[in-house]
Amino acid sequence: MAENKFKTAVLATPDLVYNEGKGALSNQYKRKVEVADCQGSVDIDFCLKDKTVGKNQCRWDYAIGSNNQSYFVEIHSADTKNIDEVTKKADWLKRWLKISAQNLDEIKHLPFYWVATSGIDVRNRNKMAKLATLNVKLVSSPLVIKA
């Protein structure tokens, strides 16, 4: 049986709960992400909401395993007014990976994905450029992760 590096990394990370397949994604969001060879998922936001590392923070939503990599996915409305919030979440994610989730950091896939819950209406190029420097890519749904 092939090693599941995603599951190993999740289990080595404090406070996270591993889920089979897309089990960590809420039902309304499962159709927003298509994953070939899904190796599991984590609801980062839920797992860390009451923990010191995540309490009162803008937290990233999900980690999804595929191809022995961790894909980080934020499912959020995509209007110009949401850019600052997603930027804060991406900043938090990068810090958390370096400080508390090094095993996931080692297998992270870039870019981080911001998946629009519906249409995309973003009109501020400067703020989008800031997201690009954080390796965040805004995509319409569904996000397709290929094997």
Segment roles from a protein language model:
Residues 55-59:
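Short, flexible loop/turn motifs enriched in small residues
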